[in-house]
């Protein structure tokens, strides 16, 4: 998937925002996922699935840092995400349908926190997250 110069610039700005508080954004995204799609909890053994949960914050931080790193490699997502795709597809056996659900939660979280979340920004972020989902799903089983 090719990204325009404008999309890359927008994605870079959003990545900078996410990089400032990866645990906070990530925990909110995961907590939102667990509420809206309770079946996604089956991959995690947490006592507290809220954004305040320590394990939710740790894993949420990992997720957001991975998105930030992917944003830095938009021209070669396939190579950049290969190891992560293998881990989720072969070792953890995460159903690929979970990735778009989490992507929606990331977009909603961004939209609730950013004062400027224009349709163009939404489209650029959605395009990045869709490409990430596609790559992560490529090694399923």
Swiss-Prot record:
InterPro entries: Globin (IPR000971), Globin-like_sf (IPR009050), Globin/Proto (IPR012292), Hemoglobin_a-typ (IPR002338), Hemoglobin_oxygen_transport (IPR050056). It comes from Mustelus griseus. This is Hemoglobin subunit alpha. Transmembrane segments: none annotated. One of its GO terms (molecular function) is metal ion binding. Keywords: Heme, Iron, Metal-binding, Oxygen transport, Transport. Red blood cells. Belongs to the globin family. GO terms for biological process: hydrogen peroxide catabolic process. The keyword Iron applies. The keyword rRNA-binding does not apply. Heme b binds at residue 88. CDD domains: Hb-alpha-like (cd08927). GO terms for cellular component: blood microparticle; haptoglobin-hemoglobin complex; hemoglobin complex. Heterotetramer of two alpha chains and two beta chains. It comes from the Eukaryota.
């Amino acid at each position: 998937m090719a990204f325009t110069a404008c999309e890359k610039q927008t994605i870079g700005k959003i990545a900078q925002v996410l990089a400032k508080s990866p645990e906070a954004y990530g925990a909110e995204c995961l907590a939102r996922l667990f509420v809206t799609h309770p079946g996604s909890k089956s991959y995690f053994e947490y006592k507290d699935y809220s954004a305040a949960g320590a394990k939710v914050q740790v894993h949420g931080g990992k997720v957001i840092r991975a998105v930030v790193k992917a944003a830095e490699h938009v021209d070669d997502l396939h190579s950049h995400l290969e190891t992560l795709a293998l881990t989720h597809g072969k070792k953890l056996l995460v159903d690929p349908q979970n990735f778009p659900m989490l992507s929606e939660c990331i977009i909603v979280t961004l939209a609730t926190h950013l004062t400027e979340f224009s349709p163009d920004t939404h489209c650029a972020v959605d395009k990045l997250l869709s490409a990430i989902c596609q790559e992560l799903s490529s090694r399923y089983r």
